[in-house]
Amino acid sequence: MLRLILVNKAGIGFLCLLSSVSSGQDYGFHQPSDFGSSKLRFPSSQSYYGADFSGFFGGHGGRRPAHQFPSFSGSGYFGGPGFGICDSPIAPCTQGKYRTYDGSCNNLGNPRLGVANSPYGRLLPPKYSDGLQAPPVSVTGHNLTSARQISAILFPDAKAPDPKWTLALMQYGQIITHDMSLAAGTTQGKAHTTMCCTPDLRAALPEDTRNPACFPIDIPDHDPVFSEAGIRCMEFVRTTNDISQGCNSGNKAAEQISAVTHYLDSSNVYGSSQQGADARREFQGGRLSVELKHGRQFPPPNNNKSAVCDHLSEEEACYLTGDIRANQNPQLTVFQILQLREHNRLAGELARINPHWDDERLYQEARKIAIAEHQAVTYYEWLPIILGRENTDRNGLTYNTQDFTYDYKENVDPSVLNDHATAAFRFFHTNIAGFLRLFDEHRSSYEALRLSDHFNRPQIIEEGNNFDDLARGMHTQPQESSDKFFTTEITWFLFRNGRSLGQDLRAIDIQRARDHGLASYNHYREYCGLPKAHSFEDFADLIDPESVQKLSYLYHHPDDVEFTVGGSLEAIVPGTLVGPTFLCIITEQFYRTRVGDRFFFENGVKDTSFTLEQVNEIRRGSISRLICDNADDVKSMQPRGFEQISQDNPVVPCSLIPAPSLEPWREIRQGEHTASQPQAVDHEFTFPFFFKK
């Protein structure tokens, strides 16, 4: 049995907090009913916080339990509907070698699977209070506690840098998220045209006069932060669902819609439609459109700045990319630009070795390679850190091979799971740092940017050497530890746009899960093979007693505890960065994302596959190589960029970071000689850095 030990970042004034909440005044606490007690009993120190997680690391003989990765059945919750809005028509499928932009025709037997503007999948049935789309209530019939109140009590701030991983690990997680999911109808940090609160935020608009999509977050009278500013209401608009779009007659539960493709296909770079992709192309040399500034490539300006940026003047940068969220924070924008530059670098190199290729061929081949590189970094660098290498190997997410994997399964639904996108994959919000440090070429930090000063304001990255110094910075600065603590930059000041206070991302996460009707934490425990909690004390197998005590005051019943809340409080499984239920759901999602994608770079599917030589070159890429090749003037990197610099991971010249060769893409036309061709680099370093044990 593995014993899990969680070391808190800092102590909390829990006795003081309880004295406040027990009166039911300071935070507007309800008095818990049948299951609430201030005298909860916890296991002894010998058994507390210990659990056997062998099932997550091959406890079933190295095979996934049948219930854990169900095949697509075309109906029910295991698989999801997988259709475009109101079954809009799609073009006939052909077995071409390139992906469509909207995700259609990836699965030739069910061409709508994973398309943009289709519903999320689900593992567990929704728990809408009316069975259709009304947000959940307690199993006792009471309203659930305010999402802001839960955030303030359970998820305070306490700074504790991660001892091993860099801030780039968290930031690349946001790139993956934006690639695979975008809740339709949300504005991602910009003011929504639908207003749910009074202009002064002192109250919610009356229900009989406000838009039905409104679901504002109530702020208690004695909130420790917002009440002092007179703020009693936080704006929140529900995600577009199939009922609101007229695709569901209202006789079955609503399913929320994702506006982007469900595949890991760099839609954040290229867009999720033909029109969107064309708007981002130069149509020369296979390149994406850029604006050159002092010889540096940046995305073209967004002509609708007010919709996506909080700029102070029209001269400030605001970029057009494949994703509306690209300007959200400086380090996210840096990664978006690195991906754009990588595409253009690939297109230029392909044009050099294949001068006879036209613009379309160069663009599509560069796009195909860039997507494959993104998949390789995600699966072979990023996921083994998050989920544990043993787990990714045993569950078919990673392979230590120089062959094809031949693991495409057309009966697996690749749709992004609501359970994943709306809860489990928001785990890394705890890893966000409130200040972004800039590092020069010598890895000396000379300045830190306050995160909330730069939400939706990317201008800072164009100034001086900030682009490189932010790129180095996130590969040098530790991320915050994986635990129950969240920086106030996102729980007090999110999207504040110059105001003294902003919004609360943790409260928004909780409210979004309610909006989507996610099942309870207890149900996900059962689904993942953990025992159901019949009392609050039963949660103490995975959650510390202090947090369990708070849960008993915040919720009326153990079945009320929400997945995004309970999962965020769990002890971290050794060798991973998440607790067991999040581990279960994220593993399931990325299994589906891989084996349900006919174009996944390793699977060897006829007509869509790379050659084996090309695949092995792609495997040589890394996040550090992305920086070396595409930053302005970064000359050195540590080989494992998601890992902090150490004696085992020293900073080395970029020339020593393995680089894929594009020689396997050289197309030899009839009559050409090959004797003078450069030789492809050897494969001595085919998994050099990601598989250290």
Which role does the model predict for each range below?
Residues 1-24:
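Cleavable N-terminal signal peptides of Sec/SRP-targeted secreted and luminal proteins
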Residues 23-345, 349, 365-507, 511, ...:
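N-terminal accessory/cap region of cofactor-dependent oxidoreductases and related radical enzymes
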Residues 359-362:
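Mobile, glycine-rich extracellular loop/lid and propeptide segments
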Residues 535-554:
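Short linear, low-complexity motifs centered on an aromatic residue
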